[in-house]
């Protein structure tokens, strides 16, 4: 996310072209990001994730993370690969479950109430203060030769250290507060999977595939069916329907855990601003129940997650 304040002429021309010609008379759209040095933008990232785990007949263990992060961005350089962007956190709401109750940290604080100095409040405050101090850099590399574009983020490396020496929360409470998680969220603001570097006609569909490693239990393969659903007033709506399957290792060890999907429902909707060359919004929803088995032990995990990325004027 670093370098060059020099504008490469050929690259700039290509980027300007991709914005001005992003939509043509045949209702084709190029889902490519467009950047100019000095551009500013604001995005709000919102995560609401609930996990319910139950082992056998034992009482269920519930976790919930509810976060809202508001970031101001300024494009500081454009080069032949993409853009270098400075980001500043201007708003932060961190919520997490401890026991059966939600606790929260808010900045700037909109209420005058002083929260009790309970352990979860203290930890959330440490997380929040470390996040506010983060010097965030973003590098956006556009699609080249058919390779998908990517986003790389730095600045959140120290947030996890605030969880050391405590036994209230596990790492799940970090939610979005990690370089990789912020990068994944912003990828949805600047790219549409499987559409980078292509002119796509309204009504067209395509498919993307991804794999998540599950260790000795195998892998989760996710196939997403996409469709360019509509184009109205310069905003293209793209919808995705992910479907997951679990692939067991070819030679699975009987002593290793196994997993199966019991239920799933997922959806993605992107509102792409053709003139700006980035998403006005992206909402991803996933509800999934996974059953893990190891010998006589069975663990059921229900996960319900909504991640939204919204551009603000």
Q: What are the residue ranges of the model-derived segments?
A:
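Bacterial N-terminal signal peptides that target proteins for export
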Residues: 1-11
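Signature of exported/secreted
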Residues: 23-313
């Amino acid at each position: 996310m670093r370098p060059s304040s020099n504008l490469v002429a050929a690259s700039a021309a290509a980027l300007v072209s991709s914005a001005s010609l992003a939509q043509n008379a045949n209702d084709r759209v190029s889902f490519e990001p467009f950047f100019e040095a000095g551009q500013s933008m604001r995005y709000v990232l919102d995560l609401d994730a609930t996990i319910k785990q139950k082992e056998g007949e034992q009482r269920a263990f519930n976790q919930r993370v509810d976060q809202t992060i508001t970031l101001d961005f300024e494009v500081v350089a454009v080069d032949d690969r993409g853009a270098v962007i400075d980001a500043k956190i201007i708003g932060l709401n961190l919520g997490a479950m401890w026991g059966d109750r939600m606790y929260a940290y808010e900045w700037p604080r909109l209420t005058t109430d002083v929260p009790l100095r309970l352990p979860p409040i203290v930890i959330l405050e440490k997380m929040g203060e470390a996040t506010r101090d983060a010097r965030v850099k973003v590098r956006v590399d556009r699609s080249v030769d058919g390779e998908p574009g990517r986003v790389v983020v730095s600045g959140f490396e120290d947030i996890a250290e605030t969880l050391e020496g405590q036994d209230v929360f596990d790492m799940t409470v970090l939610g979005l507060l990690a370089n990789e998680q912020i990068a994944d969220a912003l990828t949805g603001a600047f790219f549409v999977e499987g559409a980078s570097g292509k002119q796509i006609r309204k009504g067209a569909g395509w498919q993307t595939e991804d794999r998540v490693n599950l260790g000795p239990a195998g892998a989760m393969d996710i196939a997403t069916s996409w469709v360019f659903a509509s184009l109205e007033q310069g905003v293209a709506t793209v919808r995705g329907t992910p479907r997951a399957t679990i692939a067991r290792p070819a030679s699975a060890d009987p002593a290793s855990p196994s997993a199966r999907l019991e239920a799933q429902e997922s959806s993605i909707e992107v509102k792409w601003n053709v003139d700006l060359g980035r998403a006005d919004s992206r909402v991803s929803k996933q509800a999934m129940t996974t059953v893990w088995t190891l010998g006589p032990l069975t663990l059921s995990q229900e996960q319900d997650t909504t991640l939204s990325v919204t551009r603000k004027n």
